[in-house]
A protein has these predicted regions:
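Membrane-embedded alpha-helical bundles that constitute the cytochrome b-like, heme-associated redox core
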Residues: 1-237
Length: 237
């Protein structure tokens, strides 16, 4: 239920803040970095409860960043002339960078090598799926850094257009790894009877499964549009 609430809040945030973010992107990025810095500080040290509770709710388990990426994902499969695409597509780059920043802290915390080694030793035999999930998190961190850095406009302008497009296609691998990571982290709890874990697995599967279907459908439609229609020959011409 927690993720579903954050997802609905993320959709509302993107709808109302998209135009503002496009105009004042730096301010949003600074705010996201500040939130991540507070999250990491709270994880390694401590924060007052009135600060830690909302930050933990939003940032822990990367739920807010993932929810924003879900919006970015779906904007790409809606028809360009749809109301949703017309409102959000112009700000898609800024939204993706904002989501990217909000994911960095969580993945960094998970993939600090001493921490990963400690978890692997403690859970390696009892919960191997969780250990694999941490390894996938490391892959996600690498993909996130590459995709995030190349999303900045000044980096995009400095790159060859074909190379930039090829790099951005890695986003599909990032989305797939995100789903795999979540499943590896929640399925063990679901197997042991956690209703919350079962619900989370169901919601993520529904969202990412729907995206996969819509993405394939759009790709087929784009391919059909790009294929020239042969004109019938006129008899006697």
């Amino acid at each position: 239920m927690k993720y579903l609430i954050i997802q609905l809040l993320a959709v509302a945030f993107c709808w109302f803040a998209a135009r503002s973010m496009r105009k004042h992107a730096i301010a949003y990025y600074v705010g996201a970095f500040a939130l991540e810095a507070l999250f990491l500080y709270g994880k390694f040290f401590s924060l007052p409860g009135f600060l830690w509770t909302p930050i933990f709710f939003a940032v822990d388990q990367c739920m807010l960043g993932t929810a924003l990426f879900v919006v970015v994902m779906f904007v790409g499969v809606f028809p360009k002339n749809s109301p949703i695409a017309q409102r959000l597509r112009p700000s898609r780059g800024e939204l993706s960078i904002f989501a990217w920043i909000l994911c960095l802290g969580h993945l960094f915390y998970l993939t600090v090598i001493p921490r990963m080694a400690d978890i692997a030793i403690r859970l390696g035999f009892a919960m191997p799926m969780t250990v694999v999930g941490l390894i996938v998190a490391l892959i996600l961190l690498v993909l996130l850094i590459v995709l995030g850095v190349t999303s900045f406009k000044f980096v995009k302008r400095a790159m060859n257009a074909a190379t930039w497009k090829a790099v951005q296609r890695w986003s599909y691998l990032f989305y797939a790894c995100t789903y795999i990571h979540v499943m590896l982290m929640v399925v063990p709890s679901a197997v042991y009877g956690s209703g919350q874990a079962v619900f989370t697995a169901f919601v993520y599967t529904a969202i990412f499964g729907s995206y996969a279907v819509l993405r394939v459908k759009r790709a087929l439609a784009e391919k059909a549009e790009a294929t020239p229609v042969a004109k019938p020959e006129v008899a006697g011409a």
